[in-house]
């Protein structure tokens, strides 16, 4: 990581989006926070302030812990997985875990000047049509749009000093 962030610094990069995953929090919350802190220390050494992405609606909806499948050569983001996975997204009884994740991660780093911003949900309206659309719940967008305000509320409750945002996929979100 140090080597690659050094390359990024050499190219003039001063920020980057870093995608996190709720399953890693579920597996080992304290270890996850420790690793994020280590990453932030390395990034700061290279004058890079990341935007941490908490949730993502793009690519493989069947995320799981453990050994991941090998990347497919020549396929863009072939190993990328969504957070939350489709099972969690469709199960409101799992939402307290998501709340714990958001409040725990954001709360731990709410005043950390090494972080530029929090992208609460990347492309919440992306239906993943070109890659995994056939695996997605038919009502995925409705599920995400119902959870999105809650995710923002959790991040606000954690009292983040950094801006909160959501990188939308398409359309006019001014009324949301």
What is each of the regions a protein language model found here?
Residues 1-176:
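Active-site mouth of glycoside hydrolases
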């Amino acid at each position: 990581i140090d080597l690659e962030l050094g390359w990024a610094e050499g190219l003039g990069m001063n920020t980057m989006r870093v995608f996190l995953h709720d399953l890693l929090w579920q597996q080992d919350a304290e270890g996850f926070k420790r690793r994020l802190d280590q990453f932030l220390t390395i990034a700061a050494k290279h004058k890079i302030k990341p935007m941490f992405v908490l949730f993502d609606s793009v690519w493989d909806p069947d995320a799981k812990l453990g050994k991941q499948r090998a990347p497919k050569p020549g396929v863009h983001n072939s190993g990328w997985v969504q957070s939350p996975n489709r099972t969690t997204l469709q199960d409101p009884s799992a939402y307290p875990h998501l709340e714990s994740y958001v409040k725990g991660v954001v709360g731990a780093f709410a005043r950390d000047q090494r972080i530029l911003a929090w992208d609460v949900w990347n492309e919440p309206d992306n239906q993943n049509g070109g890659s995994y659309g056939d695996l997605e719940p038919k009502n995925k967008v409705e599920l995400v749009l119902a959870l999105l305000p809650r995710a923002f509320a959790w991040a606000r409750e954690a009292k983040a000093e950094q801006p909160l945002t959501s990188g939308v996929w398409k359309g006019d979100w001014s009324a949301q």
